[in-house]
């Protein structure tokens, strides 16, 4: 668990982190927040129960560098689904930013955040 990016993660993930800190300057914003089950949120705002996930191309396409084989790719997809399910059960809003629809400003990101509903479980 870290409060800053320290050059870990994709460049767009670090950009999103900087946007979230600008959107919520008075709130704690955590980078690569470790969940009890070993999964991580890319960016987490605990006070609001909001998680921002940057989904690089490997989240929607098989890429050998990331997955090694198709089983690895399928495991990655299942992991994303499991993270969403766990988040729903705990009332955490998951905002996914896909690599091919990256936002370009804090204002754009805020619009996306506000367009996603909290889970109703």
Residue positions per predicted region:
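Nucleic-acid endo/exonuclease domains
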Residues: 1-121
């Amino acid at each position: 668990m870290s409060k800053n990016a320290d050059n870990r993660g994709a460049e767009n993930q670090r950009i999103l982190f900087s946007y979230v800190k600008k959107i919520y300057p008075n709130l704690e914003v955590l980078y690569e927040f470790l969940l009890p089950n070993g999964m991580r949120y890319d960016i987490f705002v605990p006070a609001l129960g909001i998680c921002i996930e940057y989904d690089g191309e490997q989240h929607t396409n098989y890429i050998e560098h990331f997955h090694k084989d198709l089983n690895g790719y399928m495991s990655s997809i299942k992991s994303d689904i499991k993270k969403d399910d766990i988040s729903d059960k705990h009332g955490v809003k998951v905002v996914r930013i896909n690599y091919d629809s990256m936002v370009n400003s804090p204002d754009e990101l805020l619009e996306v955040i506000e367009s996603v509903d909290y889970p109703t479980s």
